[in-house]
C-alpha cells in the first residue's frame, strides 16, 4: 500500500536542537535577536538571512529526502502560510504544501480563488489543513468568540460554499455564516484539482464535520488503542454520508542509532522544562488538548514518567511546544511503531523533528527506508545485477510504498 509522508516546516522558526533552551534561534520569523544563529550579526552587520530562507532550506531538504510535502502551520506569531506556500513553490519541484488555516477568517469564495490560483501556478501542489480553532487566548487574538461547536458548523458551511463555486458554475448560498449570489471561479481557474482536505478535531462536533468533509482525518499521536477508537468514530459518521475517509497522524520524532542515544537527547532537553508548567492544564476549550492532559501524570518526577507505551512519549510539548505525543527510539523501533500505526489504519503521516533541517535528512535517510521491512513475510528479492531502469531519485519518490 502507499502511504503519504509529509514533513513539518517550522513557520515560527526553529531550535538549533532539542537540547537548546526553549527559544527560536534559527530562522526566527521575528527577525534578529541575541543568540540567533540565522538571521545573525556577522562582522557587525545583519547577514541578510531571513526566516523564509530557512523555510526554503527545510522544504528543499525534505523534498530531496523523499517526503511528499510539508505542513505550513498557522499561528498568530507567524507569517501567512498561503504567501509562504507560493514563495516556496518556486524553490521546489514536486513538493506539496499543506496550508493550515481557519475558515472563519476568510470568505470561502476568496479562498476558492486563492486556492485555484495556487493550483494553477504549482501544478496542483496545494493541500488543505483545516483547523477550526482551539479556543482560549489564541482564538480571542482573532476576535473570534464563536462557540466551540459553532466553529465546526462554520467550517462545514465554508467547505460547502468553497466546493460550490469551484467548478465555475454560478452558485447561490444563504447560510448562517456565509452568503453569496452567483459566485463562481472564472474560466481560467475553474476545473483545477480540488485540494485534498486534512481535517482535525477530537470533539463530537469535529468528528461529525470530519465525516462529512475530510479526505484525511488528522489527529495528533495518542496511545494506539485510543487512536483506533477515534478513527472508528470518524469512520462511522462518514459511512452515514456515503464517504470513506483516510486517516493521518502528526508525530514528532527523536530517532537515533540506539534507543539509549534517543532517550539521552530527551534527557538533555528535559533540563530546560518549566516544572510548574509541566503540571498545569492547557488553556482553551480544545477537546484534543484536554484528552492529552488525561494521559499526563498529576506529578511528574522525571521524563520517563511520560512514556505511555514503548517508544511513545507525551512530553514533547513541555520542551518546545506543539503536540505532546511523539516517538523516541532507535531507527528500527521508530519504523516499527510507524508500521504498527499503518496496521491500525493510518494512511498518511506528518512527521517533524528539531532541528527541522537536519532531522529531515536523518528521518528520510534512516527511518523511511525501514518502513514495511518488519511487515515482510518473505525475504525481499535481490535487485537485478544490471537493472534496465535506474532507481528513481528522491526528487521523484513522492509516495512511500509500504509492502
Model-found features: residue ranges?
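Acidic-and-aromatic substrate-binding clefts and catalytic sites of carbohydrate-active enzymes
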Residues: 72-81, 104-109, 223-229, 255, ...
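Short, acidic/polar
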Residues: 48-61, 81, 199-209, 266-268, ...
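N-terminal beta1-alpha1-beta2 module of alpha/beta enzyme domains
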Residues: 1-92, 192-195
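Short, conserved secondary-structure transition motifs
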Residues: 249-261, 386-403
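Conserved, mostly hydrophobic/aromatic
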Residues: 62, 66, 88, 118, ...
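Flexible, glycine-rich active-site loops centered on histidine and acidic residues
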Residues: 2-48, 105-173, 221-235, 244-246, ...
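Alpha-helix-loop-beta-strand connector modules within alpha/beta enzyme cores
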Residues: 81-99, 154, 158, 239-241, ...
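Hydrophobic faces of well-ordered beta-strands that scaffold small-molecule active sites
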Residues: 3-9, 69-72, 95-101, 126-130, ...
